[in-house]
Amino acid sequence: MNNQSLSLIETLSRDAATAAQTLAVLDEQTKNTVLLDMAKSLRASTAEILAANQQDLTRAEEDNLGSAMLDRLLLTPERIEAMAQGIETIVSLPDPVGITRDLSERPNGIKIRKMRIPLGVVCMIYEARPNVTADAGALCFKSGNAVVLRGGKEALQSSLVIAKVLQAVLQQHKLPKALITVIPDPDRGLMMELMQQRAYIDVIIPRGGEGLINFVTDNSKIPVIQHFKGVCHLYVDKDADLDNAMALLLNGKTQRTGVCNALEGLIVHQDVAEAFLSKAAVELASHKVKINACSRAAKYFTGCTVLDDSEFGQEYLDLEIAIRIVDDFDHAIDHIRAFGSHHTEVISTKNDATAMRFQRTVDASVVMVNASSRFSDGGELGLGAEIGIATSKLHAYGPMGLESLTAEKYLVNGTGQVRS
């Protein structure tokens, strides 16, 4: 790192802030036209993107990165198509910018409304997630924000090529390429400098492991929206349909392990523990899932690791799960309160009152009843491609789509009133 590099960070941040002023007043039709062209260009550039991704994968394998990281890093024609479709979904969503709502008319005749406006410049700091480059670029563009992207070294080549494709479309439409900016050097010192650019950047959204989130939160001078780890639980209630509960368990744990909405914990009411866990032992073994369990649950599994209380709450991101038998509903809630990460929690039950109590009581950004944790995703919830899942409650909570990338300002209209 040198002074020239530091100057580059400030220049890129300033250029993004300047570009954001242009985008803030762009009409929805123009935005949608640009986004559709971005989707087309991603498809047309599939071979180039895959070649860059292969460079990242080769380096990752040489560095012995884990299977979860490799899965997040991997791009395929199908995943690139999903990125393009995600952008097209964003096109179909209403533009939140400029939407107003009436609040009141005061006794003195002034009228008060609120209008949605862009945040300004959003900075994304993320690890081995090349899809974030396209998702964040498109979401920020539609919501009127410039975005500065600082990806990890693991996905650098993929991110640079994806950004180049999107920037080319911007320039074709006579828009500044600084609307989607990628920091070309993953040096950690440059990331520190980026987090000091509060004169130009309005919010930072980190996506990655626990270490990255804590580092950004501790060192940023810019407000941070945390997207923390996903320690998601399935609670099998005493009134659960056990076949449905099994489907939720297998889908949540085995469909795709290296994502934040995968199940990491299974909590089972003692009244159904024998019936459910006896079958779960067979099903999980067939999927080669490693079992970690409390002493009460361990007897149902061969070769499992017995956990004490301090060892729950891990984000495995692999074919591995922690299992606990609880005495009752309150015991389940206590476990989630102690070991959950405010991401996604699931209950399997046929009891409507219990389901409602679970949704009202559990402190998580998404609370599912009889539905897989894997639906905790912006696309699945109808938001289009998400910028992440916020686990801190300030400004946004849960999957962040277009509206979450805006704020509201007051509009006050009068006829010459003055305050006495």
Swiss-Prot record:
Gene Ontology CC: one annotated term: cytoplasm
Keywords for the protein's UniProt record, in alphabetical order: Amino-acid biosynthesis, Cytoplasm, NADP, Oxidoreductase, Proline biosynthesis
Top enzyme class: oxidoreductase
GO MF terms, alphabetically ordered: glutamate-5-semialdehyde dehydrogenase activity; NADP binding
Pathway annotation: Amino-acid biosynthesis; L-proline biosynthesis; L-glutamate 5-semialdehyde from L-glutamate: step 2/2
Subcellular locations according to the entry: Cytoplasm
Catalytic activity: L-glutamate 5-semialdehyde + phosphate + NADP(+) = L-glutamyl 5-phosphate + NADPH + H(+)
GO biological process: L-proline biosynthetic process
EC number: 1.2.1.41
Function: Catalyzes the NADPH-dependent reduction of L-glutamate 5-phosphate into L-glutamate 5-semialdehyde and phosphate. The product spontaneously undergoes cyclization to form 1-pyrroline-5-carboxylate.
Family that this chain belongs to: Belongs to the gamma-glutamyl phosphate reductase family.
Name assigned to this protein: Gamma-glutamyl phosphate reductase
Organism: Shewanella denitrificans (strain OS217 / ATCC BAA-1090 / DSM 15013)
Gene name tied to this protein: proA
